[in-house]
Amino acid sequence: VFEDGPKRDRRLWMGDLRLQALANYETYQMNDMVKGCLYLFAALPMQNGQVGACVFLEPEPEVDDTSMFDYSLLFVAALWDYYVETKDREALEDLWETAKMQIVLAQKQVGNDGVVKDCNKLGWCFLDWSLELNKQAGAQGVLLYAMKSAVAIAKEIGKDHDAECIMKTYELYRKAAKMHFYDEEKGLFVSGDCRQISYASQVWMILGDVVDEQSGIRILHDVATQTEAIEMITPYMYHYY
């Protein structure tokens, strides 16, 4: 499996897997290893069906007791990436219910206003290695991003009703994101009650298609001029930028 290096914890992390798999497709093309990792996460969910943030392999495969909002959702994106690369329809069909469950569980964290509820619990959502980063807007963006992949998967395997339902909800959440997080005066997305400006919030709102491509380009240029914007820290976050 893909795992953290010897100076880290040597676990298989879901968020990391998504990027490791993308790098693999362009280099070693060890696609069976990606497949094995996806099946491992699907086979070892948490009690409520959520994909765990990471799994241990020794002394025997076991899911950690840690879950993160964004990491679970990235299982959906990673599965769609894998299918686009391999056209492995059997795996897509096998793992669809796990992917769908991540969307269902994430929706439970969304309020009646169509916005992901903010949370003060440490580690509820990763995005980047930063304690000062407010993650509400970024979490909404990750949910939208994963929902797009879920719609694509459902359409591909003939789950038209699922695709229609997810797409309808996606549009509601996307409009809510624009209304709740976009500051017209600043021309940027803000996050949390503190209305924090960060690179992560801009990036994930753009990836969630809350704004069009030209607006996204303008936002990325503009956030770079904001001295108070919370910057990116990890190579992990820089990838999405």
Give the predicted meaning of each segment.
Residues D4-P6:
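Leucine-rich, amphipathic alpha-helical/linker segments
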Residues D9-Y241:
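Active-site core of glycosidic bond-cleaving carbohydrate-active enzymes
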